[in-house]
Amino acid sequence: MFARRVCGSAAASAACLARHESQKVQGDVIGVDLGTTYSCVATMDGDKARVLENSEGFRTTPSVVAFKGSEKLVGLAAKRQAITNPQSTFYAVKRLIGRRFEDEHIQKDIKNVPYKIVRAGNGDAWVQDGNGKQYSPSQIGAFVLEKMKETAENFLGHKVSNAVVTCPAYFNDAQRQATKDAGTIAGLNVIRVVNEPTAAALAYGMDKTKDSLIAVYDLGGGTFDISVLEIAGGVFEVKATNGDTHLGGEDFDLALSDYILEEFRKTSGIDLSKERMALQRVREAAEKAKCELSSAMETEVNLPFITANADGAQHIQMRISRSKFEGITQRLIERSIAPCKQCMKDAGVELKEINDVVLVGGMTRIRSGGGGEEVLPEGPVRGVNPDEAVALGAATLGGVLRGKASDLILVDVTPLSLGTSVVGDVFVPIIPKNTTIPCMRSHIFTTVDDGQTAIKFKVFQGEREIASENQIRGEFDLSGIPPAPRGVPQVEVTFDIDANGICHVTAKDKATGKTQNITITANGGLSKEQIEQMIRDSEQHAEADRVKRELVEVRNNAETQLTTAERQLGEWKYVSDAEKENVKTLVAELRKAMENPNVAKDDLAAATDKLQKAVMECGRTEYQQAAAANSGQC
């Protein structure tokens, strides 16, 4: 076999991307940071990106989804009821997206979350609520994206369909495709999936006139990324990226939770590890303590009535110092050092060449998780809001794609090598890691047996020399090869990575011209039919939410009318007893309707309207009679 390079230089990729971006997108484009713990949405407001506030008035939204009966809760409402509904409240689901159930990280997560993680029919990791209904991680992500979409639509005053959605730089192909699927389920046209550190670099560098070499240290709720970028003349070129897709704030929370549970076990002899509600309370307390220790030297964890035994109610009360927290989480910080060093090596730069380190992600607020020191000894700069930079950068890119922002060229890279296997389970990288994208490369393969008429191709992603030690992303067969002696047929295999980092593979028999094409979605992933069904489910949820919201509005109006009528009954002096009795009857009827949980919205609205009209008529009588009485006195 031999290889032939088709494309791959930064200049070629930039040219490809520039041509692609010359086709401007129609309509507003929102930028969404779909985070592990919090999500954020931004859009272009004039020539600047702007973060949008959600319906609760906050600029970030918890990436939490809960199901309570027939009700779906998203964001803050879902997070607030997590303690009382742990089995049906899903958080940090981004850590599951695009992963197989057998993944070692998934097996660890199963032990650490109060909800169930189950094996789907396709082998992926899904979640299951307390009623036994299963959801894919993409579906849960879609519910959060719907909230982001709604937030943008409330600000813009019209429907939104286009989005740039971010993902960790070290996400593999399956995770990127699953992220894009989440957008599709949410009713969004995801025009670009962009790496989070790259988006943050856009937010940081758009107004910079000086050429610079920067490192973006992104430690978020569930993932860690480190990227080195060169910014020069409107070109943002990623030199290298590295990271850990299972390292983030959730791991710090878990480490502190484990410490609290162990200390409680030592003093009380009680193991809380099997009590879901208690675990959720401890987890929330650990998260709160972690945040407080970013500015305080010490904090207190106080959880009264955490459980009970023969001696009565038991409480957790302990003080935790910042130094103790740093000791508990030191091993997690150390896990970020190796990716930083490898990224610098892959980029071919030395520490002294880095001009700035940009800190991104909420965890960079924590002193022990501030990061950057291993990349830039002089210390990092805090030039952007770590919670908002990624969404702002995504919105900026959306503005460029729409033609509403300054032109720029973004040259990103693929984080992991993509290739196939040959005889002996040897991995042949066709597109090496940190290759600039979009990119297309080809290799020529041949048969190993005389008369062989078909070749099975397995696509792997990773850095191990043994193919089976890497992650398999998909497989396909090319059949119909004319029989010939081994080594004679020539099959050209082409790997094409688009601007979203998603790979498409084509195998072509050069003798017959026969081809086989696939888009890599791993062995699992969502089928087109599953995505369409999830879109229908989402639309049904949206309809149910609309009906419920309208019923709540009608109930609120009914309650207001009841309060008004009951107050007026005690104040009327000139209204006849018969009219008062009529109002009392209508009040009783409306109150009875309010007590019926199955009352139809229209019936409740009609009863409310009837009472309102009667009260208004009595009010008119009261006013006229009072005016006449006052006139007679004059």
UniProtKB/Swiss-Prot annotation:
Compartments where found: Mitochondrion
Cellular component GO terms, alphabetical: mitochondrion
InterPro entries linked to this entry: ATPase_NBD, Chaperone_DnaK, Heat_shock_70_CS, HSP70_C_sf, HSP70_peptide-bd_sf, Hsp_70_fam
Transit peptide, start-end: 1-20
Keywords, sorted A to Z: ATP-binding, Coiled coil, Mitochondrion, Nucleotide-binding, Stress response, Transit peptide
Main location class: mitochondrion
A GO molecular-function descriptor: ATP-dependent protein folding chaperone
Cross-referenced HAMAP family: DnaK
Protein name (Swiss-Prot/TrEMBL): Heat shock 70-related protein 1, mitochondrial
Origin species: Leishmania major
Gene it is expressed from: HSP70.1
